[in-house]
C-alpha cells in the first residue's frame, strides 16, 4: 500500500471502519501490518506516520523506514464489523517486538469539510437566561465560514436590541433577540448556554466575614446542611478587617432560603457569617460598594448590563473571573460606577436610556479623586484571555474568531495548540480594535457553556502586572504572605555569645595498671608514677583545679573538696591476665575552688578556660573518647554540650559497655546524696544514639561537671 492522499484519515467518506494503531515499529513493512490485521477482515488501506513529524499528512513524503523509530497509523477495513473483532483482542496485542495501542477512530471536527455538512445537522445554540423572556425560538442551521454581516441576527442579547445598537448606532426601536446560533460543526447534542438548566432557578449566595483560613471545601461542608451545593468559591484577597468573601451556588431557591435561615448571623470559626442572596450587577449604582456585589461563580446576565455607557478604565477592572477555590479580580470585588469619561463625540456606543434623556458625563479625573480605591486598569483592556475551551468545538483559530466576532472587529487572535499535532490546549487570546467590543464580549461570554465546558473570559495581563496592581489596591494592609514572613523572623533568635571547645585525642600511657573489683562495675585507675593509696598529692601548677589520681575510698570523702575524678570502666580478663580497658563507662568531674584561689571566679571567660583545661588534661588508659564540645556562655550561666565519638578494640565485650552509676552508688553509699546533686545539674538527652550530654555550670558557685554516656 502506498501513502496516497486517498488513504489519509479525514478524507474517507466513512470513518466508521477505520481504527487507530499506535506504537508501530518503523522497521515493519506495510505487507506485514496488512497480514497481521487481515485475520480480522479485509483491509482496504493503511496509513503510517512517524511521531513528531513536521510534514502534513497530505504532503507526506514516500515512506522510508528509519533504523529504529516509533510510528502510529490508521487501518481501514472494508466492513465495520472488523473493528469490533480487533477491539476484542486489542489488549496485549503485539506486532514484531512492540506492544500495539489499538483505539477506535475519533474524527477531529477541524478536519471536516463543508461538503460533509448536511441540511439536518444540529447547530449549536446558546440560550441566554432571562426570567422575563421565554426562549421559544427555533434553532436555525447556519454553515460555517459565514461573514459578519450574515450572522448579525445571531448575536446574544440579554435585552431587546438589534445589530445597529451593537455597532454603536442608536436605535429607538430595537428588535428583540434572545438566541445565539453558531455555525454547526457536525456534532450533535452540543449546546452552549449561559446558565445550564440545573441552575436556571437558583441564585448565588453571598458570604461575608469568612475567616482567612477557610477553603472552598470548608465552605462546601458548612453549607451542605442546608441543601445540595453545586459550587463554592472563596476570594483569595483579604479585606481591611482580615476576612474573606465567598459565594455558594445551591441547587434550588428553597435551598438558598434554607441556608439563609440556618446560617445567617451564625458563628463559624470565630466570626459571624452574613449570608444573603447576591444582588445582580447594576450600573445604576452611583457609589462603589464596600462589599462585592457583582457577577458570581455562575454569572447571570444583568438587566441593564448593555444599557449604560462604557467607562474605559473602570471596565477593565470591574469584574472578577471566579474559579472554584481560586477567584481573581472581578466586578464583584470592585463594584461598578455609573459615570463615564467617554463622550459621545468619540463615536462610542451611547447608553440606552428608557426615558430618552441624556445622561450626565463626569470626567475620569474627577471620578478618580472621589474614588481613590479603584485600582489601575490593565495595560491593554482590549485584549481578552479565554480559557477552558472545549477542544471538540473550538479546534482552530477561525472558530475562536467566529465566537468573538459578533461583538466587534477583531484585530488578532491566537489559539494555543500542542506542537506538531494541532490539538488545542484549551486557552487563547483575542484582541479587539475597540475597548467597548472587548468589554461586551467579556461580559457576555464569561461563564457561558461552549460545548461541554464553561469558558472563562477576562482581560489579558501579565502576572507581574496583576500582582503590582492588586498590591497598590491593598497597600493599606499587608498580604498574608508578608505577615507570615514577619512572624517567622521572631522565631529565630541569635545567641548572645558562643565559643567552641575543641577536645583532641588524649595521649595514651603504656604504664597504666588496672585493679579489678568483682563486686561492682567500678575500677580504679593507677599509675606507676603516681602515689599509692592513702597518699595525697598536691595539685600541680598547670592543673590547679584538677587532681587526676585519687582512690575510690578517698573520692567519697572528698566529693565536696578539690577536683575528684572517678572513672568507671569495664575490664576483660583472659586466663588471669589483665585485658585492655576498652571503653569508659562513666566520667565524673567535681571541681571546687582551692583555698589559695579566690572564693568566686573572676569572670565567665575564666570559668570557660578552666572547663577547657580540665577537658584537655584528662588522660585515659587504653580506652578513650574524642568528644566534640560546644560551650555557650552568657552572663550568669555556661552551657557545655559534649558529643563524644568512641573508639574501642575489636575484642570488645558488650558487657563492658554497661554504663551506669549503680556500681558506684553501691560501693559508696555515703556519696549517694552528692551524686544526686551532681545529676541535678545534668541534662540528659532522650535519644541514646546521639550520645549527647549537656551540662549547666553556674559561674557564681563551685562548678560541677558530669560527662556521662547516655
Swiss-Prot record:
Domain RRM: 19-102, 222-292, 401-474
Alphabetized UniProt keyword annotations: Cytoplasm, mRNA transport, Nucleus, Repeat, RNA-binding, Transport
Keyword Amino-acid biosynthesis: no
SUPFAM superfamilies for this protein: RNA-binding domain, RBD
Subcellular localization(s) per the UniProt record: Cytoplasm; Nucleus
Matches recorded under Pfam families: RRM_1
Gene Ontology MF terms in the entry: mRNA 3'-UTR binding; poly(A) binding; poly(U) RNA binding; RNA binding
CDD domains listed in its UniProt record: RRM1_Crp79, RRM2_Crp79_Mug28, RRM3_Crp79_Mug28
Biased composition (Polar residues): 333-348, 502-524
PROSITE patterns: RRM (PS50102)
Gene3D superfamilies named in the record: 3.30.70.330
InterPro entries tied to this protein: Euk_RNA-bind_prot (IPR050502), Nucleotide-bd_a/b_plait_sf (IPR012677), RBD_domain_sf (IPR035979), RRM_dom (IPR000504)
A GO cellular component annotation in the UniProt record: nucleus
The protein's role, per its UniProt record: Binds the poly(A) tail of mRNA. Involved in the export of mRNA from the nucleus to the cytoplasm.
Protein name per UniProt: mRNA export factor crp79
Species annotation: Schizosaccharomyces pombe (strain 972 / ATCC 24843) (Fission yeast)
Encoding gene per record: crp79
Amino acid at each position: 500500500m502506498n501513502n496516497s492522499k486517498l488513504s489519509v484519515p479525514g478524507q474517507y467518506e466513512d470513518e466508521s471502519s477505520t481504527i487507530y494503531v499506535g506504537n508501530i515499529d518503523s522497521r515493519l513493512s506495510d505487507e506485514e501490518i496488512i497480514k497481521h490485521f487481515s485475520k480480522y477482515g479485509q483491509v482496504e488501506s493503511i496509513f503510517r506516520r512517524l511521531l513528531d513529524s513536521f510534514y502534513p499528512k497530505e504532503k507526506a513524503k514516500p515512506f522510508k523506514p528509519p533504523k529504529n523509530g516509533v510510528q502510529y497509523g490508521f487501518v481501514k477495513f472494508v466492513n465495520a464489523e472488523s473493528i469490533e473483532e480487533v477491539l476484542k483482542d486489542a489488549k496485549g496485542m503485539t506486532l514484531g517486538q512492540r506492544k500495539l495501542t489499538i483505539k477506535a477512530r475519533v474524527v477531529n471536527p477541524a478536519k471536516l469539510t463543508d461538503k460533509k455538512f448536511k441540511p439536518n445537522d444540529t447547530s449549536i445554540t446558546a440560550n441566554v437566561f432571562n426570567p422575563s423572556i421565554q426562549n421559544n425560538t427555533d434553532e436555525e442551521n447556519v454553515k460555517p465560514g459565514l461573514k459578519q454581516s450574515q450572522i448579525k441576527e445571531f448575536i446574544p442579547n440579554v435585552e431587546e436590541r438589534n445589530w445597529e445598537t451593537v455597532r454603536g448606532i442608536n436605535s429607538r426601536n430595537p428588535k428583540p433577540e434572545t438566541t445565539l446560533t453558531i455555525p454547526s460543526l457536525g456534532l450533535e447534542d452540543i449546546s452552549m448556554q449561559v446558565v445550564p438548566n440545573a441552575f436556571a432557578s437558583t441564585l448565588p449566595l453571598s458570604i461575608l466575614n469568612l475567616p482567612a483560613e477557610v477553603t472552598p471545601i470548608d465552605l462546601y461542608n458548612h453549607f451542605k446542611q442546608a441543601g445540595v451545593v453545586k459550587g463554592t468559591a472563596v476570594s483569595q484577597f483579604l479585606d481591611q478587617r482580615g476576612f474573606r468573601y465567598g459565594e455558594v451556588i445551591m441547587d434550588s431557591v428553597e435551598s438558598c432560603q434554607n441556608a439563609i435561615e440556618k446560617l445567617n448571623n451564625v458563628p463559624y470559626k470565630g466570626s459571624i457569617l452574613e449570608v444573603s442572596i447576591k444582588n445582580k450587577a447594576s450600573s445604576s449604582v452611583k457609589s462603589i460598594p464596600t462589599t462585592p456585589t457583582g457577577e458570581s461563580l455562575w454569572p447571570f446576565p444583568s438587566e441593564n448590563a448593555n444599557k449604560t455607557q462604557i467607562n474605559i478604565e473602570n471596565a477593565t477592572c470591574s469584574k472578577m473571573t471566579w474559579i472554584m477555590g481560586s477567584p481573581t479580580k472581578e466586578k464583584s470585588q470592585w463594584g461598578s460606577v455609573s459615570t463615564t469619561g467617554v463622550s459621545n463625540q468619540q463615536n462610542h456606543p451611547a447608553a440606552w436610556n428608557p426615558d430618552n434623556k441624556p445622561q450626565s458625563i463626569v470626567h475620569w479625573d474627577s471620578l478618580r479623586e472621589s474614588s481613590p480605591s479603584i485600582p489601575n486598569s490593565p495595560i491593554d483592556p482590549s485584549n481578552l484571555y479565554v480559557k477552558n475551551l472545549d477542544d471538540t468545538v473550538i479546534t482552530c483559530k477561525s472558530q475562536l474568531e467566529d465566537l468573538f466576532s459578533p461583538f466587534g472587529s477583531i484585530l488578532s487572535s491566537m489559539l494555543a495548540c500542542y506542537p506538531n499535532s494541532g490539538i488545542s490546549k484549551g486557552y487563547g487570546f483575542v484582541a479587539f480594535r475597540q475597548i467597548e467590543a472587548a468589554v461586551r464580549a467579556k461580559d457576555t461570554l464569561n461563564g457561558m457553556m461552549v460545548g461541554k465546558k464553561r469558558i472563562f473570559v477576562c482581560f489579558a495581563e501579565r502576572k507581574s502586572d496583576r500582582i503590582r496592581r492588586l498590591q497598590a489596591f491593598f497597600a493599606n494592609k499587608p498580604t498574608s504572605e508578608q505577615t507570615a514572613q514577619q512572624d517567622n523572623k521572631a522565631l529565630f533568635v541569635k545567641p548572645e555569645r558562643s565559643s567552641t571547645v575543641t577536645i583532641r585525642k588524649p595521649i595514651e600511657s603504656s604504664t597504666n595498671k588496672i585493679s579489678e573489683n568483682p563486686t561492682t562495675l567500678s575500677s580504679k585507675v593507677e599509675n606507676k608514677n603516681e602515689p599509692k593509696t592513702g597518699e595525697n598529692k598536691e595539685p600541680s601548677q598547670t592543673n590547679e583545679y584538677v587532681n587526676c589520681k585519687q582512690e575510690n575510698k578517698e573520692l567519697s570523702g572528698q566529693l565536696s573538696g578539690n577536683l575528684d575524678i572517678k572513672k568507671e570502666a569495664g575490664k576483660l580478663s583472659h586466663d588471669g591476665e589483665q585485658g585492655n580497658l576498652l571503653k569508659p563507662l562513666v566520667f565524673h568531674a567535681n571541681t571546687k575552688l582551692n583555698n589559695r584561689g579566690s572564693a568566686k571566679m573572676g569572670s565567665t571567660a575564666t570559668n570557660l578556660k578552666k572547663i577547657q583545661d580540665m577537658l584537655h588534661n584528662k588522660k585515659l588508659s587504653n580506652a578513650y573518647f574524642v568528644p566534640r564540645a560546644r560551650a555557650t556562655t552568657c552572663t550568669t550561666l555556661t552551657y557545655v554540650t559534649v558529643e563524644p565519638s568512641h573508639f574501642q578494640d575489636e575484642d570488645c565485650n558488650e558487657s563492658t559497655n554497661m554504663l551506669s552509676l549503680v556500681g558506684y552508688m553501691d560501693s559508696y553509699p555515703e556519696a549517694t546524696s552528692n551524686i544526686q546533686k551532681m545529676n541535678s545539674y545534668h541534662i540528659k538527652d532522650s535519644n541514646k544514639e546521639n550520645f549527647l550530654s549537656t551540662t549547666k555550670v553556674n559561674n557564681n558557685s563551685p562548678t560541677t561537671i558530669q560527662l556521662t554516656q547516655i
